């Protein structure tokens, strides 16, 4: 049995930054530290931070007065920011800078009353935060997920239209939606550079390159992780069965029956410790040597807020 390890995999710069913000806040200000929504979508990471004193909530109303709250990497709406300001909560913003870039695009369009189409998954916190940047009553903002949604879309002014996308989508599927938008609305404008984040692109490329060489793909990531789900879906689209897991005990022997090569990758919110635990579980079940593949080098780094840089930990 051969176990091939994708590269790049796991943590991206935005996730690294978000986790560091929570860790530094816990160290410098002491527990409890409140975090609005899971700071990143990984059960392993969230449980570790809970044990250190982080309290995860879904609404600001759950945060007591005079406390610290951290916004998750997925971003929040302007309404949430305004509520925190009105309550004079101390806020540390762990929103990924690449998500903030999309927020700025939407806010800029809103100020000019340009209608905006967001490509994304309904209910995802990043989508909720991005939709919440639009305030113009003269324009409008619309959510689409697939090309068929575009055909049903009714806008006020097709000549004054802009699109943005969630940062963790399938590269191929997003391209299909953009193609349909351009077909239905020939004058639509978009970002100069794709909104899909570099880490999402790189991890999908790594799966694309590896899928034909393996018989089954194990994606390390949580079920609520958008980018991890896209990796599993991409593998299956390419003809290689894929399984998503964030717990070694969930890995089943039946996944590997009749297989000789196993591919392992990890979503952008999955830590390397968890990847190693999953690999150990696979080896305990079926044996096998691990070969780490070469891949695109990532050197992106995002600073934590200045207030959290005062003290090294």
From Swiss-Prot:
Highest taxon of the lineage: Bacteria
Cofactor, how bound (note): Binds 1 [4Fe-4S] cluster per subunit.
Pathway membership, UniProt: Isoprenoid biosynthesis; dimethylallyl diphosphate biosynthesis; dimethylallyl diphosphate from (2E)-4-hydroxy-3-methylbutenyl diphosphate: step 1/1; Isoprenoid biosynthesis; isopentenyl diphosphate biosynthesis via DXP pathway; isopentenyl diphosphate from 1-deoxy-D-xylulose 5-phosphate: step 6/6
Binding-site residues for (2E)-4-hydroxy-3-methylbut-2-enyl diphosphate, renumbered to this chain: 41, 74, 124, 167, 225-227, 269
Matching CDD domains: lytB_ispH
Active site residues according to the UniProt entry: 126 (proton donor)
Record InterPro entries: LytB/IspH
GO molecular function: 4 iron, 4 sulfur cluster binding; 4-hydroxy-3-methylbut-2-enyl diphosphate reductase activity; metal ion binding
Alphabetized UniProt keyword annotations: 4Fe-4S, Iron, Iron-sulfur, Isoprene biosynthesis, Metal-binding, Oxidoreductase
Coiled-coil region: none
Gene3D superfamilies: 3.40.50.11270, 4-hydroxy-3-methylbut-2-enyl diphosphate reductase, catalytic domain
Annotated binding of dimethylallyl diphosphate, by residue: 41, 74, 124, 225-227, 269
Annotated residues for binding of isopentenyl diphosphate: 41, 74, 124, 225-227, 269
Single biological process term from Gene Ontology: dimethylallyl diphosphate biosynthetic process
EC number: 1.17.7.4
Record's catalysed reaction(s): isopentenyl diphosphate + 2 oxidized [2Fe-2S]-[ferredoxin] + H2O = (2E)-4-hydroxy-3-methylbut-2-enyl diphosphate + 2 reduced [2Fe-2S]-[ferredoxin] + 2 H(+); dimethylallyl diphosphate + 2 oxidized [2Fe-2S]-[ferredoxin] + H2O = (2E)-4-hydroxy-3-methylbut-2-enyl diphosphate + 2 reduced [2Fe-2S]-[ferredoxin] + 2 H(+)
Cofactor: [4Fe-4S] cluster
Protein family membership: Belongs to the IspH family.
Function of the molecule: Catalyzes the conversion of 1-hydroxy-2-methyl-2-(E)-butenyl 4-diphosphate (HMBPP) into a mixture of isopentenyl diphosphate (IPP) and dimethylallyl diphosphate (DMAPP). Acts in the terminal step of the DOXP/MEP pathway for isoprenoid precursor biosynthesis.
Listed name of the protein: 4-hydroxy-3-methylbut-2-enyl diphosphate reductase
Species whose genome carries this gene: Photobacterium profundum (strain SS9)
This protein's encoding gene: ispH
């Amino acid at each position: 049995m051969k176990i091939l390890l994708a590269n790049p995999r796991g943590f991206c710069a935005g996730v690294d930054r978000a986790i560091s913000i929570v860790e530094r806040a816990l160290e410098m200000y002491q527990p409890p530290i409140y975090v609005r929504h899971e700071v990143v979508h990984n059960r392993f990471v969230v449980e570790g931070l809970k044990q250190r004193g982080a309290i995860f909530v879904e609404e600001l109303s759950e945060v007591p007065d005079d406390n610290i709250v951290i916004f998750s990497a997925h971003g929040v709406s302007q309404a949430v920011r305004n509520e925190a300001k009105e309550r004079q909560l101390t806020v540390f913003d762990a929103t990924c800078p690449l998500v903030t870039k999309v927020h700025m695009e939407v806010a800029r369009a809103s100020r000019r009353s340009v209608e905006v189409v967001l490509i994304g998954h309904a209910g995802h916190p990043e989508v909720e935060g991005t939709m919440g940047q639009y305030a113009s009553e003269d324009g409008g903002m619309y959510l689409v997920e697939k090309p068929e949604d575009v055909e049903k879309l009714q806008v006020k002014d097709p000549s004054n239209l802009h699109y943005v996308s969630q940062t963790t989508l399938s590269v191929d599927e997003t391209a299909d939606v953009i193609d349909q938008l351009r077909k239905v609305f020939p004058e639509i404008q978009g970002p100069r550079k794709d909104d899909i984040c570099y880490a999402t692109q790189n991890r999908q490329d790594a799966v694309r390159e590896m899928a034909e060489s393996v018989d089954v793909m194990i994606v390390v990531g949580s079920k609520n992780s958008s980018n991890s789900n896209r990796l599993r879906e991409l593998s299956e689209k390419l003809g290689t069965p894929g399984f998503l897991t964030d717990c070694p005990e969930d890995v089943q022997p039946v996944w590997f029956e009749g297989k000789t090569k196993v591919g392992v990758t990890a979503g952008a919110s999955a830590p390397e410790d968890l990847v190693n635990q999953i690999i150990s579980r696979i080896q305990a079940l079926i044996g096998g040597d691990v070969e780490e593949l070469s891949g695109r080098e990532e050197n992106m780094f995002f600073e934590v807020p200045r207030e959290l840089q005062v003290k090294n930990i």
